[in-house]
């Protein structure tokens, strides 16, 4: 708060709560990939999306659930209880970014990040009534790189997703498939 009072916020997201899908490493936290089958070893470093969010001052409030290895279009996991759609708990939130979709729809905060190979951002968006974006492969650097997997924002409005893209699309040398830096006017996409 003192930084804001001085007019010196840490970055675009200083103090803004954010959730991150559990397959994106955050330093000191395990990365269970939605399954009870992997050992819970704390991550040594933040993956690029988590690093960019921290650098911008975001406050990470939770890791969000996903199905085992992200291989279902539901919130069913051997590690977590079943994720539910907050609009109708008899239904699922879609997946594999199930927890992020449910968290965004329930208003757990304004900013959430998930990943997508075959609909994992887009299904929760349509099933939970939120906005998400699966950017082009490499637009948001990710580590470890995986062909076809993209990280992307999950929000309740386009303007918040555009704000996240300004932060998440910054370069990171750990992703060999990252696209070259482009100065995209993400803020123009909320018009």
Protein language model regions, located:
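Flexible domain-boundary/linker segments
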Residues: 14, 70, 120, 177-182
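Residues on a specific face of well-ordered alpha-helices
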Residues: 51, 98, 106-107, 111, ...
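Gly/Ser-rich catalytic/binding loops embedded in alpha/beta enzyme cores
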Residues: 1-117
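Structural signature of FAD isoalloxazine-binding scaffolds in flavoprotein oxidoreductases
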Residues: 122-127
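A short helix-breaking turn/cap at a secondary-structure junction
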Residues: 130, 134-191
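Short, hinge-like loop/turn segments at secondary-structure boundaries
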Residues: 78-81, 128-132
